[in-house]
């Protein structure tokens, strides 16, 4: 990755970093062509702008349409980046069929990430060969490789840090201008580069896209429903300035476990409610969590309160914190707790889980106190989708949950 002199523990100076990094990139590439993998997020966009300062017309930005992005996102990103002051020419590569085929039938979160990574770099290799490029530039930042090295989860854009030689495996070398930076530093650098606020302050979106929010088996229908739910959640929560907010999707398959009754009793005790007003179910599909700084695959407990209790306890932070902590500590196989917001009896086979967190560095995160009225409105909108019968709100901080579900 090279030495970066301006990144210090106590401070970050965008102008110094930019000067050092552009000089490093010029020396490294020696006038050769470089492909930049752009997702539309702040990390890859800032990395591309840094590289353009150094490489000019030798930089070729592309965006891969994986089929796992938001509704109309590839076209919107291309159009927005082409505007002044960025004036970035972005080429779209359509490969949605390849990505969906690569994860078909796979339910394990880590295996899905690895298969996405393999397809992602295969597509990049093909594009690099077309342009006769030896280098691929990407927006890897420090939390990406820290989580991968720590065994918490595989980030698709982390290679060399985990012993994968991209030159040998894929036929090109990797450039990562931001690999020592954290999200707040990347945003500061973006502002220094006159990146419009819609990019510099944009909430993070994972490289594998909706893949890591589609819990369990991935199907075109689940992705379609998730795209619509994502649009509703992001539109509803954008005024609140939470660092990250999104929807995940899970099938309504529940574990037939005798401990479910005990989980319900634990939830009742934590909330100070009669057992008759609290009911818990445990989903079969597992999600990624963190315990003792290590990755674990845990279950999701869905907690349903009576209608009256839901209105009363819809957002009492202390009680919900006790609810989550009480269940996770007593049942080690559970890493997440979600509170039921809305349901339709006899509805479809899918549930949507809404997540919103507040964080500075994305290494830890607190649950954001979304007003109960807003959650109910989100639930009402999402329930118009006939395949969805339940909407939950995730009340799990990081740790023991990760921000993303897979």
Residue ranges, per PLM feature:
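ATP/NTP-dependent adenylation/nucleotidyl-transfer catalytic domains that generate, transfer
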Residues: 2-406
């Amino acid at each position: 990755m090279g030495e970066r002199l301006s990144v210090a523990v106590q401070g970050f100076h965008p102008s110094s970093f930019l000067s050092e990094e552009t000089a490093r990139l010029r020396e490294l590439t020696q006038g050769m062509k470089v492909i930049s993998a752009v997702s539309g997020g702040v990390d890859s966009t800032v990395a591309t702008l840094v590289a353009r300062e150094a490489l000019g017309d030798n930089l070729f930005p592309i965006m891969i349409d994986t089929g796992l992005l938001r509704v109309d996102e590839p076209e919107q990103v291309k159009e927005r980046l082409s505007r002044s002051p960025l004036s970035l020419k972005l080429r779209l590569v359509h490969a949605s069929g390849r990505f969906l085929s690569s994860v078909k039938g796979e339910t394990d979160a880590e295996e899905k990430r690895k298969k996405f990574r393999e397809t992602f770099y295969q597509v990049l290799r093909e594009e690099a060969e077309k342009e006769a490029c030896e280098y691929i530039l990407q927006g890897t930042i420090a939390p990406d490789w820290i989580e991968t090295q720590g065994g918490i989860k595989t980030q698709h854009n982390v290679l060399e840090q985990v012993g994968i030689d991209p030159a040998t495996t894929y036929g090109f070398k990797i450039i990562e201008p931001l690999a020592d930076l954290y999200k707040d530093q990347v945003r500061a650098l973006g502002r220094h580069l006159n990146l419009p606020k819609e990019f510099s302050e944009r909430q993070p979106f994972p490289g594998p896209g909706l893949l890591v929010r589609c819990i369990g088996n991935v199907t075109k229908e689940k992705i379609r429903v998730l795209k619509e739910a994502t649009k509703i959640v992001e539109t509803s929560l954008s005024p609140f300035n939470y660092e990250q907010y999104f929807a995940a999707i899970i099938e309504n398959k529940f574990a037939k476990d005798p401990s479910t009754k005990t989980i319900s009793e634990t939830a009742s005790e934590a909330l100070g409610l009669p057992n008759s007003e609290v009911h818990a179910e445990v989903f079969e599909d597992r999600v990624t969590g963190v315990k003792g700084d290590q990755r674990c695959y845990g279950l999701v407990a869905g907690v349903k309160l009576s209608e009256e209790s839901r209105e009363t306890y819809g957002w009492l932070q202390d009680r919900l914190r006790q609810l989550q902590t009480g269940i996770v500590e007593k049942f080690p196989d559970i890493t997440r707790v979600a509170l039921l917001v809305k349901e339709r009896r006899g509805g479809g086979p899918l549930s949507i889980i809404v997540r919103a967190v507040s964080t500075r560095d994305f290494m830890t995160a607190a649950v954001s106190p979304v007003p109960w009225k807003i959650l109910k409105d989100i639930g009402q909108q999402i329930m118009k989708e006939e395949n969805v019968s339940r909407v939950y709100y995730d009340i799990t901080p990081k740790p023991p949950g990760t921000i993303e579900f897979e």
